[in-house]
UniProtKB/Swiss-Prot annotation:
EC number: 6.3.2.8
Protein name, entry field: UDP-N-acetylmuramate--L-alanine ligase
Pathway terms, separated by semicolons: Cell wall biogenesis; peptidoglycan biosynthesis
Family (UniProt): Belongs to the MurCDEF family.
Organism: Xanthobacter autotrophicus (strain ATCC BAA-1158 / Py2)
Cell cycle in keyword set: yes
Annotated function: Cell wall formation.
Gene behind this protein: murC
Top-level EC class: ligase
Length: 470
């Protein structure tokens, strides 16, 4: 697996980002000279430095003095001093998706797209192909617990990639197997309308070559409608839907382990294959659906059933996806990246099925624009939580929007019938608030894409300091 040699030093602007860090790591492991910069230290920056990659903190024109190629993500503004310097020097400037596409060009690729579930599904596909001795290269949008990283370089002919639709660049990725988990209104700052979001996913599937196939979840009505619009490409449908080609059956959500089976049917509706006794060591029907997508791909690529069953049973999950951070007095605390109403509802439903006590949701809304555009959905996605604690919005660089803040969300939840909603002043008050609500057997789920992950890891210790266990 090689790009042209002699590229010189490849500089990543924002190398600590989850998408950029994975590409940088794979290029480094291929033997290329890689360096980069980021605004702050982070776990990803530390990991890259431990690999021997030079990372500068802060953006400055001098950082690209020794660069021969500059890679940028869509988050990098045109006036970034490193981008300005690169263009002044007439250096090649490559978008993140273009560099990813260049890596993908050298392998057969499975690309996982969808508004939710991409990262977990990508990890599951990687685990199943690994179990089938495919030794895939993987670039994911989250840290895979089994690898301790979001990227790995494999010796096999296949590559598994999370396809980020947020800026439309997923349409540049050369894909032989496309997975679409769901399609919801999101990233409207780029697409402007939901119709354009759906059109982009249609193009994503139609870009698959004639010898490839798409795996699409028809439990989701928008995806089912999309299936009906796609011509001249092979589509394998999956879901609990009785019409699915690969059907999720016999789901049992008790005890934090998801037990299920998968039935494969031909176009005449006849069962041609069945895998039963699957056990996924994480809660939630949404995770069983993600696993079904991965199983559909693995089965199509001839991974044996016993390897599929073993890989699902040993699946280690993804960091920040229902990740247990600790326990205090019988209260278990979890960290989850969920920041869209559909994701939040799915996580809380899983928690409700797994918990023997109450479910306490602590949410840090991510971006004013998302809260504003999906306000009604946010007001109704916490039904499976006995208590909701709402923190101030994590701005992510945005300016406030009237009516889209913590207090309006608290009012909205109460107006929509929620019985227990508390406004949180800040993380320093979290232990006191949760300590007043939680009892042994309860689950506390910290939700959001911002700084709340740190709160989730600190909370068990803060609770212990505040209220020693009985």
């Amino acid at each position: 697996m090689k790009l042209p040699s002699g590229l010189g030093s490849i500089h990543f602007v924002g190398i600590g980002g989850i998408g950029m860090s994975g590409i940088a790591e794979v290029l480094h492991n291929l033997g290329y000279e890689v360096q980069g910069s980021d605004v702050a230290d982070s776990a990803n920056v530390k990991r890259l430095r431990d690999l021997g990659i030079k990372v500068m903190i802060g953006h400055s024109a001098v950082n690209v003095d020794d660069a021969d190629v500059v890679v940028v993500s869509s988050a990098i503004k045109r006036d970034n001093p490193e981008l300005v310097a690169a263009r002044t020097k007439r250096l090649p400037v490559v978008r993140r998706a273009e560099m990813l596409a260049e890596l993908m060009r050298l392998k057969s690729c499975v690309s996982i797209a969808g508004t939710h579930g991409k990262t977990t599904t990508t990890s599951m596909v990687a685990a199943l192909l690994d179990a089938g001795n495919f030794d895939p290269t993987v670039i994911n949008g989250g840290i895979i617990n089994a690898y301790g990283t979001n990227a790995r370089l494999g010796d096999g002919n296949w590559m598994v990639v999370e396809a980020d639709e947020s800026d439309g660049t997923f349409l540049k990725l050369p894909t032989e197997v496309a997975i679409v988990t769901n399609v919801d209104p999101e990233h409207l700052d780029h697409f402007k309308t939901f119709d354009k979001v759906q059109d982009a996913f249609k193009t994503f599937v139609e870009n698959v070559p004639f010898y490839g196939f798409a795996v699409m979840c028809i439990d989701h009505p928008v995806v089912q409608a999309l299936v009906g619009r796609i011509e001249d490409r092979r589509v394998i449908t999956y879901g609990e839907n009785p019409q699915a080609d690969v059907r999720l059956v016999d789901v049992d959500l008790k005890g934090g382990i998801t037990r299920f089976g998968v039935v494969f049917r031909n176009r005449a509706g006849e069962t041609v294959h069945e895998i039963s006794g699957l056990k996924l060591p994480m809660p939630g029907k949404h995770n069983a659906l993600n696993a079904t997508a991965a199983i559909a791909v693995a089965h199509e690529l001839k991974v044996p059933d016993d390897k599929i069953i073993e890989a699902i049973a040993n699946f280690g999950g993804v960091k920040r996806r229902f990740t247990r951070t600790g326990e205090w007095n019988g209260v278990t605390v979890f960290d989850d990246y969920g920041h869209h109403p559909v994701e939040i509802a799915a996580v809380l439903k899983a928690a409700r099925a797994a918990s023997e006590g109450q479910v306490i949701a602590v949410v840090q809304p991510h971006r004013y624009s998302r809260l504003a555009s999906l306000f009604d959905e946010f007001c109704t996605c916490f039904n499976d939580a006995d208590h909701v604690v709402v923190a101030p919005v994590y701005a992510a660089g945005e300016t406030p929007i009237e009516g889209a803040d913590r207090d309006h969300l608290v009012q909205g939840l109460i107006a929509h019938g929620h019985r227990s909603v508390t406004a949180l002043e800040g993380p320093e008050r979290l232990a006191q608030v949760v300590g007043g609500l939680a009892k042994p057997g309860d689950y506390v789920i910290c939700l959001g894409a911002g700084s709340i992950s740190g709160w989730a890891y600190a909370l068990p210790g803060e609770l212990a300091a505040l209220k020693p266990a009985a």
